[in-house]
Amino acid sequence: MTAQNIDGKAIAQAIRTKLKDKVTARKEAGQRVPGLAVILVGADPASQVYVGSKRRACEELGFISRSYDLDSSTSEDALLSLIDECNEDQSIDGILVQLPLPEHIEESKVIERIRPDKDVDGFHPYNVGRLAQRIPVLRSCTPMGIMTLIQSTGVDTYGLDAVVVGASNIVGRPMSLELLLAGCTTTTCHRFTRNLEQKVRQADLVVVAVGKPGFIPGEWIKPGAIVIDVGINRLESGQLVGDVQFEKAAENASFITPVPGGVGPMTIASLLENTLYACEQYHDHD
């Protein structure tokens, strides 16, 4: 068996085209366009690349994009004050603070300062809680994008044994909740998990998000499984690779996401979907 690649780039582009059409229709109807505030603290090169991609995507779709590039020495209070301003700005539907933040700033305090109806990253405890209670509104972008990729395969997720490798607040934990909502029997694995190989070998669906190149050997993948590789790691050679050993995994799996061009584009597409959703559902009556 040779796996079929799940083309995240093409699926994300289709979503962006639909969103652009909706924004155009809003303009023609005399409605305002969605607005996204993107806040970057410091000059982390990877963060600068991600933020640049998000800003360009906003402009391409006709969203308002507000950029705030703050020095790494910016105080926590100053950042919280800026978030307060964006919370009150009626032209802003979504607020994104690029993570990670400098060590002197407490991430949880920053995330909780963003109004839940403007939390387009889906990290606020309110929005994570809504997902846990099976009534999601603004969902975490990467898991949301992954669910779209899984749906694109046409495979019925109800009753599948799913394994999520990685338990971060950004991907692993909300991913497990999404899969539970989709009817999977879900196991979350982390650094203390025993017999990881045994768990992965039994999985019909594997999502890996640990940030370690080739962490999951391709031989572990069950024949016919769906493999979602969230990792994006740059080797010394400059090559980008995922957390799963792709070539061997692709021999066993039925569907697999490539790196790059799999999960990455979907994260930004989901962010844009969330921003339009916040505009339409929460703020059109403001």
UniProtKB/Swiss-Prot annotation:
GO cellular component, as recorded: cytosol
Q: Which family does it belong to?
A: Belongs to the tetrahydrofolate dehydrogenase/cyclohydrolase family.
* Alphabetized UniProt keyword annotations: Amino-acid biosynthesis, Histidine biosynthesis, Hydrolase, Methionine biosynthesis, Multifunctional enzyme, NADP, One-carbon metabolism, Oxidoreductase, Purine biosynthesis
Write out the GO biological process terms: L-histidine biosynthetic process; methionine biosynthetic process; purine nucleotide biosynthetic process; tetrahydrofolate interconversion
Q: Catalysed reaction per UniProt?
A: (6R)-5,10-methylene-5,6,7,8-tetrahydrofolate + NADP(+) = (6R)-5,10-methenyltetrahydrofolate + NADPH; (6R)-5,10-methenyltetrahydrofolate + H2O = (6R)-10-formyltetrahydrofolate + H(+)
Query: What is the organism of origin for this protein?
Result: Shewanella piezotolerans (strain WP3 / JCM 13877)
Which residues of this UniProt protein bind NADP(+)?
Answer: G166, A167, S168, I232
Known partners and oligomeric status:
Homodimer.
| A Pfam family the protein falls into | THF_DHG_CYH
Q: What is this protein called?
A: Bifunctional protein FolD
EC number(s): the record gives 1.5.1.5, 3.5.4.9
Q: Which domain of life is it from?
A: Bacteria
Does the entry feature the keyword Mitochondrion, yes or no?
Answer: no
Pathway entry = One-carbon metabolism; tetrahydrofolate interconversion
Q: Which Gene3D superfamilies match?
A: Leucine Dehydrogenase, chain A, domain 1, NAD(P)-binding Rossmann-like Domain
Q: A Gene Ontology molecular-function term?
A: methenyltetrahydrofolate cyclohydrolase activity
Cite the SUPFAM superfamilies for this sequence: Aminoacid dehydrogenase-like, N-terminal domain, NAD(P)-binding Rossmann-fold domains
What is the role of this chain?
Catalyzes the oxidation of 5,10-methylenetetrahydrofolate to 5,10-methenyltetrahydrofolate and then the hydrolysis of 5,10-methenyltetrahydrofolate to 10-formyltetrahydrofolate.
